Every structure is written in structure tokens, then in C-alpha cells.
Amino acid sequence: MPKGCLVITVSGLAGSGTTTLCRKLAEHYGFKHVYAGLIFRQMAKERGMTLEEFQKYAELHPEIDREVDRRQIEAAKECNVVIEGRLAGWMVKNADLKIWLDAPIRVRAERVARREGITVEEAFMKIAEREMQNRKRYLNLYGIDINDLSIYDLIIDTSKWSPDGVFAIVKAAIDHLDPVGDAGSKKEKEVG
């Protein structure tokens, strides 16, 4: 692993494996794990709302998203932190490594169904509705198209590997990371 202060963001849609990966990274490297989804869920619980109710509430109250984002940006000032959230890669502009995890919606629905003890069909509908709401909200609030993956350094389809396989890929990326500058760029010589 490169020496120094690393800030890594891990983003992805529901059921893509972001939390699993972040837990493994935090455990292996001793990184602090900042989880935007947990912040959001805690805020819903504080207001006595389900996640779905709070999602709709947040659409009308942009201060909710801004508070979650503020906490992520604040966390990025620390060293050796992995920040998990759908917009983490967008919010933490100077992250050393920005990762996006993806998987087909059917695979993600199966994972969410197992995790939440609901049917795959229920999970599919919840995910589809939530993603539509989030996409609209992020576009209106920040002008961010969540489907634009151009800002990410590493994009992984987690349906192709086990959680340990995904971790191995990311570990290799971290262990060979050149956080100073752009390892692949051709620097122009200064002309004087």
C-alpha cells in the first residue's frame, strides 16, 4: 500500500456490494469507514420514518442530502479513510481512488431480498423506485447524473466475482496506487 494519507471512495447502487467491500477494506487496512447510507438511515430513524418515507421526504428537503454530503466531505479531511456513498466520488473530488461497483439489477435485487428478508420481486420494485427517485433528486439538487461513471478510476461488475474476488481486485489497485499525480499521463516538458 502506498505510504501516506489515502482517501478512497466507494460508490454503487443498492445491492452492488459497497458495504461488504468497505468493511473488508476498513478491516484489512485499518481505514476508518464512513458510510453515507448509515447516516441517511439514522436520520430517517431519528424522524420515525421508514427508509422509503424518508427518501420521499428528502426529495422535498434538500438540506438532508446536503448534511449527508457535508459529513462525507468532512471525513475526507482525515487520513486513511474509505467513504461509502452513491455520491461519494462526486463529493470528495480529491479522493486518491474512486471506485464504482455495479451489477445487473436482478442480481442486486436477489442480494437485497436476502439481506432484508423480502421477495426478489419486492426488492426489485424497491430498488427501481429508489433509483428513479435518487437519480431525479441528484440531478435537481446537484446537476449530477448518477449514471455518468466518467469520474471513477475503477469500475467493477460485482456479479462476476465473489466478495473476496472484488476485494482482491481493489486491494491490488490500492497496493499499486500512485497517489501523487497521474501515473499514466505524459507530462509536457516546460518550455522556457
From Swiss-Prot:
Q: Where does ATP bind?
A: G12, L13, A14, G15, S16, G17, T18, T19, T20
Alphabetically sorted, this entry's keywords are: ATP-binding, Cytoplasm, Kinase, Nucleotide-binding, Transferase
State the SUPFAM superfamilies in the record. P-loop containing nucleoside triphosphate hydrolases
What Pfam families does the database record attribute to this sequence? Cytidylate_kin2 (PF13189)
The enzyme class is transferase
The record's Gene Ontology biological-process terms are: pyrimidine nucleotide metabolic process
Its GO CC terms? Answer: cytoplasm
Query: Is Nucleotide-binding set as a keyword in this record?
Result: yes
Q: Which reaction does it catalyse?
A: CMP + ATP = CDP + ADP; dCMP + ATP = dCDP + ADP
Listed GO MF terms: ATP binding; CMP kinase activity; dCMP kinase activity
Q: Is Metal-binding among this UniProt entry's keywords?
A: no
Record-listed E.C. numbers: 2.7.4.25
Cell compartments where the protein resides: Cytoplasm
Give the matching CDD domains. Answer: CMPK
**Family, similarity comment:** Belongs to the cytidylate kinase family. Type 2 subfamily.
Q: Which NCBIfam families match?
A: cyt_kin_arch
Q: What is this protein called?
A: Cytidylate kinase
The species this protein belongs to is: Pyrococcus furiosus (strain ATCC 43587 / DSM 3638 / JCM 8422 / Vc1)
